[in-house]
């Protein structure tokens, strides 16, 4: 966790911010259609927590999350990885989609490490 380059930090934060926007848009559309939004809400909260924890570890910004929320977010973020990795495996080498997925995987992995680091203090 300590040896993360500034480029990786910036890309990870941007990736998580992009993921948050994507989930917010999905939540809005699903709400309008009357669809069940529980899963999207949980994922949105988990990604927000992941971003807050990375900013806490890297930029010493405070976060207001309790241990139970951190633990739940960690499990949700870890649960997202297999489906993203599967999409990555199906993507074409050098494609913008693969670049996006690479950054998203890295950001999620770093978020999980950051949450683990908070628990091991």
Stretches found by the model and what they are:
Residues 1-7, 28-32, 56-67:
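Short, charged, low-complexity loops and linkers
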Residues 2, 8, 14, 118-121:
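Short acidic DE-rich linear segments
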Residues 6-9, 37, 70, 98:
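Short amphipathic alpha-helical segments that mediate assembly, nucleic-acid/protein binding
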Residues 29-36, 90-95:
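A cross-kingdom feature marking solvent-exposed beta-strand/loop segments within repeated
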Residues 35-46, 96-107:
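Short, charged, amphipathic alpha-helical segments
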Residues 46-64, 83-90, 107-121:
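Amphipathic alpha-helical coiled-coil segments
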Residues 63-93, 98, 102:
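Amphipathic protein-protein interaction modules
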């Amino acid at each position: 966790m300590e040896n993360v380059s500034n480029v990786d930090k910036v890309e990870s934060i941007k990736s998580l911010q992009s993921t948050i926007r994507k989930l917010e848009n999905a939540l809005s559309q699903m709400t309008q259609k009357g669809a069940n939004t529980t899963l999207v809400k949980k994922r949105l909260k988990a990604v927000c927590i992941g971003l807050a924890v990375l900013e806490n570890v890297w930029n010493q910004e405070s976060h207001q999350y309790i241990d139970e929320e951190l633990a739940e977010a960690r499990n949700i973020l870890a649960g997202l990885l297999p489906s993203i990795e599967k999409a990555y495996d199906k993507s074409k080498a050098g494609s913008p989609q693969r670049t996006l997925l690479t950054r998203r995987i890295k950001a999620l992995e770093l978020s999980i490490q950051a949450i683990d680091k908070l628990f091991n203090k």
